[in-house]
Every structure is written in structure tokens, then in C-alpha cells.
Curated annotation (Swiss-Prot):
EC number: 6.3.2.9
Pfam family, one: MurD-like_N
Gene3D superfamilies (UniProt xref): Mur ligase, C-terminal domain, Mur-like, catalytic domain, NAD(P)-binding Rossmann-like Domain
Function in brief: Cell wall formation. Catalyzes the addition of glutamate to the nucleotide precursor UDP-N-acetylmuramoyl-L-alanine (UMA).
Protein known as: UDP-N-acetylmuramoylalanine--D-glutamate ligase
Catalytic activity: UDP-N-acetyl-alpha-D-muramoyl-L-alanine + D-glutamate + ATP = UDP-N-acetyl-alpha-D-muramoyl-L-alanyl-D-glutamate + ADP + phosphate + H(+)
Family: Belongs to the MurCDEF family.
Gene name in the database record: murD
Pathway: Cell wall biogenesis; peptidoglycan biosynthesis
GO molecular function annotations of the record: ATP binding; UDP-N-acetylmuramoylalanine-D-glutamate ligase activity
Length: 440
């Protein structure tokens, strides 16, 4: 708890699941603290769960609280560049996030994953593999449980997904191993450019014993000398080799598992599996005990998930594809018998969607564009239709469906124009898929 030296007044900025986990954690410390919460929303989620001795200011900022704090704990959604935080920064007040508080408190090994795409799958898969090896494992961070809530599980190993937003306010997190999966354009509404975004991601390596990088994406390599292990589709530390005409996932030249035995489909999931293997190997976990999980694991909800399959028509929920690279990954692994009915759109976060054009050109498809930035997709391909909502898009495409077709939601955008989050968007798609499948 060394980070709390001299701290008496703490201001938590942003409530919700993460903010509540911070308040709960602070109340458990042995130090006597005055805790106050600021949330710009009029009725922030979780406000009714705050204890009476924690004061809440909602509906705007409270500058007096901020400049008189000893420590400010910000929600990942609050950028450090926010002008409201500048007076506190200028005054030298320490600003951290929930992951930094986790770093001060954790007393078991931690491994962590970041990247533009695939990090949720790798985090979840790594956790499942560790559990299969008999290790008491807690999984969370930017996925599932807030990191501070995981401490209650008293785990032997913590597996964290970390976003660039979380890493901005994290500086002392010691990791047995850290993986930087890939880097592609995302969150350009938050960062000044790709270099700025990359630097936020690279913070994951600051105190990592082993840094796992992507041989096919040199942007994932740290700028300073570190202990590196790499993954890729060629032979290397962790890669692919061919033996007797069969492709294997391998550690150096040692085959571990045939690629066709993986429960996950798509080339990108070979890479995801290699990262999980590399992380667990670095953490000293017996790989032999984990490989069966690779055979049975079939992925996350909202990530290339078949939610309905009726009359030869498959409905695929890929709502977690909130950027262009995620949608490109989904399209690259498709096996189509008929036409693809692709649903795209939402909040584009300043992204350049033109990268999708070559992938779209090679597919038998019709694209339905909806949401705040749906109009930005229409010019990418002449086989496009602009709709107000996803409901309207599905009602429009449904009468045209034939056996062998696929309806895929892979929006390449954030969801918060029309939905609370990507999960709510995926749930809405799943409900519509099941409804229309019954009717067909």
C-alpha cells in the first residue's frame, strides 16, 4: 500500500462498475480516508450503492474537490487531457486508475494482455487454460470483473485484459508476462495519432518480466531493451510448423497441437492461441495440462458467435468488432456458401473505414449500414444500403435470405449512439436473429 503515503483525501472520478469497485476497495484499506465521488451524469449507475459516508457530486465537475485532493482515481473513460483535470495536474496531485490501485494491493503473480484486437479472447482463453492446469485463477480488468473486485478471490494467478485507457494511469504494475497483440487504428477521438496510441499500449511492458510481441507487427515491440518472446505464423519462439503435411502450433520446433484440432476457427485464433501458450509458459504453468482446453474452447459471447442456424441460414454476432481491424479479422476467416448480409455502423471514433473496401470487394455480399456513422460506409461498396437502425436493416434483408446465406453483425464501430454497450447491441441482434429464425 506504499502508494497511499500521505494520502487522506481521495476523489474518485466516474462511478459505474469500476468506480464502485474503487470505492469499495478504498473503504477496506487500513488507512483512514475521506472519499468523494464526481460523476458528470445526473444519475450515474451505482449511485444508490454508495455508503452514506461517501459524498457524491453528480451532473458536472467539482473543481474544489479535485484541487484539494491528495489522490484522484479516474475512470478509464476520463482522458488525462481533460481540461477539468489540468489544475490538479499542474498542482502535482497524483492521478491514477483502478489498475494502479490493484498493483499496490496484489500479492500473487499477474499476467496481462493488451492490443487493438483479440485481447478479450486471449484473456478469457488464458484464464480457462490456467484453470485447467489446476491453478486458482481470476480473470478480469477490461473484461468481466473489475480488477479490484478480483482481489476478493484470493487467486494464485491473475489474468488481466488492459486497455490503452487503463494503461495511461498505470505505472507500477509488476507482471510475470505481458502481451501486446497488435496495433491498428482505434480511439483516434482520444489520441493525437497512432504514435500516441502506441505509447499508451507500450506502458504494459514497463515492469514485465517477459514481453510477448507479434513477429508480424513490429509496432508491438518495446522501444527499450526487454526480455522478449515472440509469436507468429512462421517458426519461432511460438509459431507454426508443418509436420507430415499437417500444420501444428509449436514452441520453437516442438509441435504442441495440430491447428485443425483448435476449437476456435479462423487464422487470427491460431495467433490468439499461441499468445495464451506463451503467457502461461512464461508464468511457469505446465503446458501439457492446458492443451485440451484449446480443443474445447469455442470463444467469447459477441465475438464471431453463431447465435442462430435455421434452414441453412447462419446468424453471427460479432458485436465486439468495434473497430475496422476487428471486422477485417472476422471477414478474413469466413466460409460462405451463399451471400453475406453484413451489418455495419455505429460510432466510428474518427476511424478510416476505407481499409474495408478490398475485403468487401472479394465477397458475395450486401452491406446494411446503420447508426450515427452508417453513412460513412455506403461509399465503400455499391452493394450498400443505408438504414436508421439495426432493426430496420434486419427487417429489410430478411425477405431476401436464401439457404446458405449468413447474416453477420460486425459493425466496425462503437455502440453508444443506440445501445448502452457492445454487449447490449449483441444481445439485441441475438434476439432478432432468434425471432426471425423461428419465422423462417
Amino acid at each position: 500500500m506504499s502508494g497511499f503515503g500521505g494520502v487522506k483525501n481521495v476523489v474518485v472520478v466516474g462511478l459505474g462498475m469500476t468506480g464502485l469497485s474503487v470505492v469499495k476497495h478504498l473503504l477496506k484499506t487500513t488507512i483512514s480516508l475521506t472519499i468523494k465521488v464526481i460523476d458528470t451524469r445526473d444519475t450515474p449507475p451505482g449511485h444508490d450503492q454508495l455508503p452514506e459516508n461517501v459524498e457524491l457530486h453528480s451532473g458536472g465537475w467539482q473543481q474544489d474537490w479535485l484541487i484539494n485532493a491528495d489522490l484522484i482515481v479516474t475512470n478509464p473513460g476520463i482522458a488525462l487531457a481533460s481540461p477539468q483535470l489540468k489544475p490538479a495536474i499542474d498542482k502535482g496531485i497524483k492521478i491514477v486508475g483502478d489498475i494502479e490501485l490493484f498493483a499496490w494491493a496484489v500479492n500473487a503473480p499477474v499476467i496481462a494482455i493488451t492490443g487493438s484486437n483479440g485481447k478479450s479472447t486471449v484473456t478469457d482463453l488464458t484464464g480457462e487454460m490456467a484453470k485447467a492446469a489446476g491453478v486458482k485463477t481470476a480473470v478480469g480488468g477490461n473484461i468481466g470483473f473489475a480488477a479490484l473486485d478480483l482481489l476478493e478471490q484470493d487467486a494464485e494467478l491473475y489474468v488481466l485484459e488492459l486497455s490503452s485507457f487503463q494503461l495511461e494511469t498505470t505505472s507500477t504494475l509488476k507482471l510475470k508476462a505481458a502481451a501486446f497483440l497488435n496495433l491498428s487504428e482505434d480511439h483516434m477521438d482520444r489520441y493525437q495519432g497512432m504514435a500516441d496510441y502506441r505509447q499508451a499500449k507500450l506502458r504494459i511492458f514497463e515492469h514485465a518480466e517477459v514481453c510477448i510481441v507479434n513477429r508480424d507487427d513490429k509496432q508491438t515491440y518495446p522501444d527499450v531493451e526487454k526480455t522478449l518472446k515472440s509469436f507468429g505464423f512462421d517458426q519461432g519462439d511460438y509459431g507454426c510448423i508443418e509436420k507430415d503435411g499437417i500444420e501444428y502450433l509449436a514452441k520453437n520446433t516442438v509441435p504442441l497441437l495440430a491447428a485443425n484440432e483448435l476449437g476456435l476457427v479462423g487464422k487470427h485464433n491460431i495467433a490468439n492461441s499461441l499468445v495464451a501458450i506463451a503467457l502461461l509458459d512464461a508464468a511457469g504453468i505446465n503446458l501439457d495440462a492446458t492443451l485440451d482446453t484449446l480443443r474445447t474452447y469455442n470463444g467469447l459471447t459477441h465475438r464471431c458467435q453463431v447465435v442462430a442456424d435455421n434452414n441453412g441460414i447462419r446468424w453471427v454476432n460479432d458485436s465486439k468488432a468495434t473497430n475496422v481491424a476487428s471486422t477485417l479479422a472476422a471477414l478474413s476467416g469466413l466460409q460462405l456458401e451463399g451471400k453475406l448480409h453484413l451489418l455495419v455502423g455505429g460510432v466510428g471514433k474518427g476511424a478510416d473505414f476505407s481499409e474495408l473496401s478490398p475485403a468487401l470487394h472479394d465477397l458475395n455480399l450486401m452491406m446494411y449500414c446503420f447508426g450515427e456513422d452508417g453513412d460513412q460506409f455506403v461509399s465503400l461498396d455499391p452493394r450498400s444500403l443505408l438504414c436508421e437502425t439495426m432493426n430496420e436493416a434486419i427487417a429489410t434483408l430478411y425477405p431476401t435470405l436464401n439457404k446458405g446465406d449468413m447474416v453477420m453483425l460486425s459493425p466496425a464501430c462503437a455502440s453508444f449512439d443506440q445501445y448502452a454497450n457492445f454487449m447490449a447491441r449483441g444481445d439485441a441482434f441475438t434476439q432478432l436473429a432468434k425471432q426471425y429464425s423461428i419465422e423462417s
